[in-house]
């Protein structure tokens, strides 16, 4: 073989080797890319909500195509407000007021590409997946033992005879506590409302709970006679035969929605996240409404026992800033 032919042959071998290396690297990186294309879902939902969403995604063929991480409302809210669209998540389910506030700050969500038949109007970038409504609940046996009249209002829980016998959620830790504060401010205004809250907190004493489910647990256990929390939990407890009753307070039943939104990463994963969002809205609701019985979409119905008698909305839009104002109001009332 001549020197020139030898060089040509070597050059050809080197070229083929280089090409094979490129294909090997592309194959390796594409497998990593496949991994990175999994939709990352952040949610503040509890176990029942997560189960409903995952069932819908699995039935739609998305098993193995997403990674779901559950975070507390304050933790996920903090990440949204600090990181904006740099957040790892492609899809979030979260308290609607946090979605509104993070959108105002960062414009981080993509308009939803699908339509729904929601009963109320919502921004173009999210739709509700569930709603929670506040109410009073009581342990009927403890009321009898203590000779207490069933309360008709939040203000009734400030009476001296209820001292040490009331449990409420702390607005500093739980959004359920915000439902109570909204009711007090709406009915009594800030001046009288502060006194009502002061007297209520004094009666609550050590029964101020960090979890929205804390009060119903204490009422069910008979540790206190009355509490404020999520209405559907009291309805469920009563239906199970527990000595629990629910009371729609005269100040009103206020609600908070949790919604789904797609973070606009402007890539193929964003498109897949959008399809998953549509699946959750359209397929998970049948399970979600069972555990959170508030009708949000046309055609949905709930039993009469799940319809609050005093359903109300706060006069101002719910935002993180308003929550912080009401947290200060609560602390100042102590």
For each predicted feature, which ranges?
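Conserved N-terminal structural module of periplasmic/extracytoplasmic solute-binding proteins
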Residues: 31-88
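A ligand-binding cleft/hinge motif common to bilobed small-molecule-binding domains
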Residues: 97-103, 220-221, 225-243
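Short, low-complexity disordered leader/linker segments with a strong preference
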Residues: 1-39
């Amino acid at each position: 073989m001549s020197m020139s032919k030898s060089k040509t042959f070597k050059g050809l071998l080197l070229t083929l080797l280089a090409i094979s290396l490129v294909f090997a690297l592309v194959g390796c990186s594409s497998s990593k890319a496949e991994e990175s294309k999994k939709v990352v879902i952040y949610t503040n939902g509890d176990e029942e909500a997560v189960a409903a969403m995952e069932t819908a995604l699995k039935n739609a063929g998305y098993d193995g195509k997403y990674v779901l991480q559950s975070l507390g409302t304050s933790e996920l809210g903090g990440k949204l407000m600090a990181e904006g669209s740099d957040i790892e998540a492609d899809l979030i389910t979260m308290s609607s007021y946090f979605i509104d506030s993070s959108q105002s700050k960062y414009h981080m969500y993509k308009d939803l590409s699908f339509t729904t038949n929601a009963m109320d109007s919502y921004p173009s970038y999210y739709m509700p997946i569930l709603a929670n409504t506040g109410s009073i609940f009581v342990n009927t046996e403890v009321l009898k033992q203590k000779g207490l009249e069933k309360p008709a209002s939040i203000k009734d829980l400030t009476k001296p005879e209820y001292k040490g016998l009331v449990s409420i959620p702390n607005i500093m830790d739980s959004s359920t506590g915000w439902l109570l504060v909204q009711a007090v401010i709406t009915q009594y205004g800030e001046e009288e409302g502060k006194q009502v809250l002061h007297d209520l907190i004094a009666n609550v004493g050590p029964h101020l709970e960090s979890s929205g489910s804390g009060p119903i647990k204490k009422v069910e256990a008979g540790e206190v006679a009355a509490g404020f929390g999520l209405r559907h939990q009291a309805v469920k407890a009563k239906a199970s035969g527990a000595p629990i009753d629910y009371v729609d307070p005269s100040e009103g039943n206020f609600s908070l929605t949790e919604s789904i939104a797609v973070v606009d990463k402007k890539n193929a994963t964003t498109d897949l996240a959008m399809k998953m969002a549509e699946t959750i809205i359209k397929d998970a609701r049948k399970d979600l409404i069972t555990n959170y019985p508030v009708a949000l979409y046309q055609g949905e119905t709930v039993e009469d026992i799940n319809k609050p008698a005093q359903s109300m909305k706060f006069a101002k839009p719910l935002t993180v800033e308003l929550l912080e104002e009401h947290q200060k109001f609560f602390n100042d009332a102590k």
